[in-house]
Amino acid sequence: RLLAKHPAFETIYIAAGSNAGEKITSIHSHLSAYSGQTFSSTSSSEIDKCDLVFLALPHGESASIIKEIGDQVKVVDLGADFRLKSATSWKKYYNDSYAGNWLYALPELPGKRSAIAAAARVANPGCYATAIALAAAPAVRGGGINGSDIVVVAASGTTGAGRTAKVNLSGSEIMNSLTSYKFGGVHQHTPEIEETLEDIAGSQIKVSFTPILAPMPRGILATVTAKTNIDE
């Protein structure tokens, strides 16, 4: 949506594996700037014609396709494949082989904006990780809180679960209801949040994270609490 009418960008290639051949506006009606255009199949040769590419693929697929993309193409990966520094954490939370890590592209954090501008490959942060890291960063950076026990409860809208039809996301199930899920330290954004805050704090961070599915289409409300380091 941002790129569709952006004066600094010309969109020359839009691929969608499962929707290849379909009109873009039949899937995303708000993208009127692409009226009459269709989704293409994913092709590394077409990607290589681009100056900048955004990848929005399921876990593990960006790591596979990046091997076929030329080094001259700048890439922003919207998936999780290159977010984590720790191979152990990746294997634990994603149960897949580790592909390495790229610059973590959260521009509001210290020093990140200039680093992103100079990078050829960047990893876009996750949704929960963005909201929680930005909420906690000022207190963590200032040393005002005890980073060994940060507690987060965050509610997300239904679009965070993707477009695939699911019973638990139907109107009758979701309306007037709040549902916690992937709690107890198993949500895949947990290590991402901890790594991001550890970079700021310069010390170990531990996060207790409870995500909640809320009856709203989009958005995240994150409540972040911790004990202070300020003497009474």
Residue ranges and their predicted role:
Residues R1-F183:
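N-terminal Rossmann-like NAD(P) cofactor-binding subdomain of oxidoreductases
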Residues G160-E232:
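Charged docking surfaces used in two-component/phosphorelay signaling
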